[in-house]
A protein has these predicted regions:
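Juxtamembrane membrane-water interface segments that cap and precede transmembrane helices
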Residues: 19-21, 25, 93-107, 169-184, ...
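Transmembrane signal-anchor hairpin modules in multi-pass inner-membrane enzymes, especially those
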Residues: 1-146, 202-221, 248-277, 302-304, ...
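Hydrophobic transmembrane alpha-helices of multi-pass, membrane-embedded glycosylation machinery
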Residues: 35-43, 197-200, 240-253, 378-381, ...
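Hydrophobic transmembrane alpha-helices and their immediate junctions
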Residues: 368-406
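A membrane-periplasm/extracellular boundary helix in multi-pass inner-membrane enzymes
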Residues: 79, 153-162, 170, 228-235, ...
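Membrane-interfacial helix-loop-helix modules of multi-pass inner-membrane proteins that assemble, modify
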Residues: 77-104, 140, 150-191, 225, ...
Length: 469
């Protein structure tokens, strides 16, 4: 049933729009809404598969990893040994199914986290199936690009007007200095922007290398400039450093190829365009108070050695001998960390919801087996995508597929680097976008068949999803 299939996909695109605008998915209300949208999309997708009898091309390894992670996390929540009482800072013992086996130290937190985690894993499978359609692949790309531009524009507007808080919220008495666009923490905003600006760059490249309408070229070039300028205006130094590295890598990879395909006149136009873009970025920088992030770089040598995140990481490392195969339970870092912090020689003040090191936090919550499976899902997806991209039959992919997968890999490399000293992979909106990109990466292994079917339909007149569209 095309109507059910399309409804599921439109709802998923709605989740991609909603997540970054709803404070990046950092409030309980926004997380619940994201969960409901993903659940609705997944249910409609399953209904469509059952009615049509269609069998999606899902990689077996991805299915195994999804089932294994849902199984481990679900068991840890089901067999929880206690629940954390935040009023008295104590763990209240619970009756559990198998006391001798592993279980979470906080039932409520792990159950809530696994609800979101299971839906995100299903989201990866959903995108694998969606990516087989050329039309929906482009719709997905357009959605990400437009949302990216809107978030970037809001952040730049805040900087230009000297906003003391997100426009529709009241600024606290002590002032707020770490917000950007709809994100309360500039590090998360920077991680999100580094996830999306490579895809806006891809849309700009696609617009200028195909017979696109001049309006589309202007639109996607504007989105690219906005998102890149937003990274520069944001005060997250790590985000700026990663953006610079990614931009250099893209120039080295794509620059020579693009120049070879241009005539002498087109090269001169491209150089003039590059100068115009540079001047535009400079003008945006002046209008959006670019001196603020530049001033933060001047104090980097003083701040980094004394940053509390390094001591927090040492406290977390001291807990590693106790994690076992399956860890303390999904999402339990915030309740486990205080116990180790209070007795550590590296004691750090304050309340820590997340560790500024995603990989170490994952090891604490999921143990050696669980974190290994997450690593295989994330980095394995990137490896699968790179291998698919280099296969001989990948040369027959449509240009949109080759471009989108390449830029998705670049974006995932960026968030993987950011996760070394921050917590982007704990934020719901970033998790959703990473799951989407991983779906594109894992789905690339089946693109050969979908492209072959597409060409067969064009020449043989057979009906299919793309022909109906």
């Amino acid at each position: 049933m095309p109507i059910v299939r399309d409804a599921a996909r439109w709802i998923f695109l709605a989740a991609l729009i909603y997540a970054p605008w709803a404070y990046g998915g950092t409030t309980s209300a926004s997380i619940q809404m994201i969960n409901w949208l993903l659940l609705a999309a997944f249910i409609l997708w399953v209904i469509e598969l059952l009615i049509s009898g269609r069998r999606p091309a899902l990689p077996r390894l991805l299915l195994f990893l999804t089932c294994a992670l849902v199984g481990i996390g679900g068991w840890m929540a089901l067999n929880a040994k206690s629940i954390y009482d935040s009023d008295f800072y104590a763990f209240v013992p619970l009756w559990n199914l198998a006391p001798q086996l592993a279980g979470s130290v906080d039932y409520a937190t792990s159950a809530a986290w696994m609800t979101r985690g299971a839906l995100l894993l299903c989201g990866i499978l959903f995108v694998v199936d969606l990516s087989q359609s050329n039309r929906w692949l482009l719709r997905l790309w357009y959605t990400i690009g437009l949302v990216a531009g809107s978030i970037a524009f809001l952040g730049l507007l805040q900087k230009a007007t000297g906003a003391r808080m997100i426009f529709w919220q009241e600024a606290p008495p002590w002032g707020a200095t770490t917000f950007f666009a709809t994100y309360y923490y500039h590090g998360n905003a920077g991680a999100y922007l580094n996830l999306v600006w490579p895809l806006t760059a891809g849309l700009a490249v696609r617009a200028f290398t195909t017979s696109s309408h001049p309006g589309m070229r202007a639109l996607w070039m504007s989105m690219f400039i906005l998102t890149l300028a937003a990274v520069a205006a944001n005060t997250s130094r790590m985000a700026q450093l990663i953006a610079l590295l990614l931009f250099i890598a893209l120039c080295v990879k794509l620059g020579p190829t693009l120049l070879r395909n241009l005539s002498r006149i087109e090269k001169n136009i491209a150089i003039a365009g590059a100068i115009a873009i540079l001047l535009t970025l400079v003008a945006l920088g002046q209008a959006t108070h670019l001196e603020q992030p530049l001033n933060r770089w001047q104090t980097v040598s003083e701040r980094i050695p004394n940053d509390a995140r390094w001591r927090a990481s040492r406290v977390a490392i001291s807990a590693l001998p106790d994690v076992g195969f399956f860890g303390f339970g999904p999402g339990t870092f915030r309740v486990v960390f205080p116990s180790y912090n209070s007795v550590s020689i590296n004691h750090v003040p304050g309340t820590w919801r997340f560790l500024h090191e995603d990989y170490l936090q994952t090891a604490l919550e999921w143990g050696w087996v669980g974190s290994g499976l997450w690593g295989l899902l994330f980095f394995g997806g990137m490896v699968i995508a790179i291998r698919s991209y280099k296969k001989p039959w990948a040369q027959h992919w449509r240009p949109r597929r080759r471009l989108l997968q390449f830029f998705a890999i670049v974006a995932l490399v960026g968030v993987a680097l950011h996760a070394l000293i921050d917590f982007p992979l704990q934020i719901a909106s970033i998790q959703l976008y990473v799951a989407t990109y991983l779906g594109l990466c894992w789905g690339g292994a089946a693109w050969q068949r979908s492209e072959v079917r597409g060409r067969g339909k064009e020449h043989g007149g057979q009906s299919s999803e793309d022909s109906r569209e």
